[in-house]
């Protein structure tokens, strides 16, 4: 398993309740797992922008 980093976030009660519903329905085993999946989807959405930024950093 690759190294991990622990973070802390604040969510509205509404968002947290929706995440709990996903866990209770069996879609995820924990709220943390649901948040990790959300981050993964976000990073995939911005993959091209992130690659461009990484390339710009190479030229600095």
Swiss-Prot record:
GO terms for biological process: regulation of DNA-templated transcription. It comes from the Archaea. Pfam families: RHH_1 (PF01402). Disulfide bonds: none annotated. Signal peptide: none annotated. Coiled coil: none annotated. InterPro entries: Arc_rbn_hlx_hlx, CopG, Ribbon_hlx_hlx. This is Uncharacterized protein AF_0569. It comes from Archaeoglobus fulgidus (strain ATCC 49558 / DSM 4304 / JCM 9628 / NBRC 100126 / VC-16).
């Amino acid at each position: 398993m690759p190294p991990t980093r622990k973070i802390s976030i604040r969510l509205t009660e509404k968002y947290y309740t929706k995440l709990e519903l996903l866990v209770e329905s069996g879609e995820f085993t924990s709220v943390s797992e649901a948040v990790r999946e959300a981050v993964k989807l976000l990073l995939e959405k911005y993959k091209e922008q992130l690659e461009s930024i990484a390339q710009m950093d190479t030229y600095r």
